[in-house]
């Protein structure tokens, strides 16, 4: 799944109106070099959110719920070696979207998390 998260947390982290993300199975994710450093914050679901950052440059690379081992991980699309294939399929947390953010009217919108 590929989408854009418009929550205030993602706005703060990115310095922009949303974070473009790609959801992949955790076992399919492999860091090609270096290692991740993690930062934990309160999740919008009430638990903890685990963000992975490049230990060398500080770029945000991953995000996942951390209260339990997660079968999926969110990758920040702009951090991929080739993000040109990214095609958003949905917008989430549109209730937090900025009024000047021009969302694609052709993809589904969810006020909070997407169902499922």
Enumerate the language-model features and the residues they cover.
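A short Gly-Trp-Pro
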Residues: 1-116
């Amino acid at each position: 799944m590929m989408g854009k998260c418009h929550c205030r947390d993602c706005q703060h982290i990115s310095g922009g109106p949303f974070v473009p993300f790609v959801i992949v199975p955790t076992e399919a994710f492999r860091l090609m070099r270096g290692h991740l450093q993690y930062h934990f914050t309160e999740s919008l679901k009430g638990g903890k959110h685990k963000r992975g950052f490049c230990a060398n440059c500080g770029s945000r690379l991953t995000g996942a719920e951390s209260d339990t081992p997660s079968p999926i991980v969110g990758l920040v699309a702009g951090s991929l070696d080739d993000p040109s294939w990214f095609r958003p399929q949905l917008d989430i947390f549109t209730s937090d979207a900025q009024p000047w953010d021009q969302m694609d009217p052709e993809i589904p919108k969810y006020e909070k998390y997407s169902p499922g």
